[in-house]
A protein has these predicted regions:
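Residues that act as N-cap/strand-start positions at coil-to-secondary-structure junctions
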Residues: 1-4, 342
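Cleavable N-terminal signal peptides of Sec/SRP-targeted secreted and luminal proteins
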Residues: 4-22
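Signature for phosphate-centric chemistry
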Residues: 23-117, 121-306, 310-472, 477-481
Length: 481
């Protein structure tokens, strides 16, 4: 693997649980038809709130080379490494590739169609992460002739309209708030009592008692406040900054464990919560894979690689829904999974193989069958094939993969039902969310109304032009075309 690596003493490895052993064989006659990845953004600077919740860490906050909350130079390199790994694994001209699936350029075979589609969560650190992957996947020299670089377009939504990556921040906000309030009254006090010593130490280090965080200007709830402070110390470590005076490595690790336990238990303790945390991404993933499950795929006139970029919460939620267990050695654990390295990437390979004679007898009209092969990679660990615990085999049949998600949602109801969300229809006050809807809506104008608007615009334009000519002549100026 090229690019960013830790020193050998700090190299972390994936535990064996959930990973496929090297000597386990798989069908070698399958073909890759579509590739989907979901990546966590890279290392970032702490959230703004820590300026008031830990004023004694000001020296470290001032040392960051980027604005607070944004991707650091280390985070950018981590995601560039993701792109380089994808290039090494799937690019046609790479010597150690596993499969010749992607062209050397974004522009595809004979410049017929972009091969890769990038979509990011509304947060800028997610879109920057997507851009950094593009740098690694399409380095200088792979752009169109005459322009060495390859700009990669990133699709994004406003956060209030982002239902596939951030439903809890939009239509599910009130549902989330209700669940968080219940957690704060039940489980959170139990955990805080267990970690009382480290929380008291945190208050002394930062100069603000944990219980006072909600009362500060621009403060937040205590659980989220502890999470943001734990993140701050971890980000400081990743940036190579010194420990804040009074903080110890042991206390930082305990704080990180508390924050991760809170995150997992208050977001994913029930199937219902998992459903709305995944939100519309489950539909996006299923549709993206299903559209590639045809014998003519991948066509030169369509995308073949879909690169999605979000927060750790989406990866954890999807993992819980699918039975994808994360086990990174040395990281905090809760609900039988570990936390994630920055840049952790989930790979979904849609593959096709010829039917066996027995399968052909049962499905006379079908020519091939489809399955999903899953891998995991991070800037700190090697590529590992993952078996979903909810699937019967490692190479999960596409129908069974779909059923894992649909069965989960059938138990809980859709995220829209859980969050009491009703998709706006054209004619309501809400603006349409897609370009197609906008175009369709514009077609609804009556011909006379359109002509009236154009007529008024022409009259106003002529009047303004006449006024400018008159004014110029009064001032002795000559009009310039």
């Amino acid at each position: 693997m090229r690019g960013f690596r830790l020193t050998p003493a700090l190299m972390l490895a994936v535990l064996a649980t959930g990973a496929i052993t090297a000597d386990q064989s798989f069908p070698s006659d399958s073909e890759l038809r579509r590739l989907v990845t979901l990546s966590r953004h890279g290392s970032r600077a702490p959230n703004d709130v820590v300026k008031v919740t830990c004023p004694r860490n000001k020296a470290n906050l001032d040392a960051y080379k980027v604005p607070l909350t944004q991707l650091t130079e280390i985070g950018m390199k981590q995601l560039q490494d993701v792109g380089e790994h994808i290039r090494d694994t799937y690019m046609v001209d790479e010597p150690h590739r596993e499969e010749a699936f992607l062209s050397r350029s974004l522009n595809g075979v004979n410049h017929s169609h972009f091969e890769a589609y990038f979509r990011a969560d509304a947060a800028t650190r997610c879109s920057q992460s997507a851009t950094a992957v593009g740098y690694g996947l399409y380095p200088d020299g792979t752009g169109p002739q005459g322009f060495p670089r390859q700009p990669v377009p990133i699709t994004m939504q406003l956060v209030e309209n982002e239902h596939a990556f951030a439903a809890p921040k939009g239509p599910c906000r009130s549902t989330l708030d209700e669940d968080l309030a219940e957690y704060a009254e039940t489980r959170a006090p139990e955990l805080f009592a267990q970690y009382r010593d480290v929380l008291d130490q945190l208050g002394e280090v930062c100069g603000v008692a944990v219980e006072d965080i909600p009362n500060l200007p621009d403060g937040e709830d205590v659980v989220l406040g502890v999470k943001d402070l734990a993140d701050m110390f971890v980000f400081d470590r990743d940036e190579g900054l010194p420990l804040t005076e009074g903080m110890t490595v042991e206390a930082r690790e305990k704080l990180e464990q508390l924050a991760f336990t809170n995150l997992m238990e208050r977001y994913y303790s029930t199937d219902r919560e998992i459903t709305y945390w995944v939100g519309g991404f489950s539909d996006l993933l299923l549709n993206t894979l299903q559209e590639g499950a045809i014998s003519t795929a991948p066509s030169p006139a369509e995308y073949r690689y879909f690169s999605f970029h979000g927060h750790r919460e989406l990866l954890h939620g999807l993992g819980m829904m699918l039975g994808w267990e994360f086990h990174f050695k040395g990281l905090p654990t809760a609900l039988n999974v570990s936390s994630l390295h920055p840049g952790t990437t989930m790979f979904f390979e849609l593959r096709a193989r010829k039917l066996t004679t027995e399968e052909t007898e049962k499905q006379s009209e079908a020519k091939e069958t489809y399955f999903v092969r899953t891998y995991m990679w991070s800037p700190y660990t090697e590529r590992e094939q993952i078996k979903l615990t909810k699937c019967s085999v490692a190479d999960c049949p596409l129908d069974e993969f779909n059923q894992i998600i649909t069965n989960h949602i059938a138990k809980t109801g859709t995220w829209e039902t859980i969050c009491n969300y009703h998709k706006p229809t054209l004619g309501q006050d809400e603006a349409p969310l897609t370009q197609g809807a906008v175009v369709e809506n514009n077609h609804g104008f009556a011909g006379c109304s359109f002509v009236t608007v154009i007529g008024i615009a022409m009259v106003v334009g002529l009047a303004l032009a006449a006024f400018k000519v008159y004014t110029a002549r009064r001032r002795g100026y000559t009009m310039v075309g």
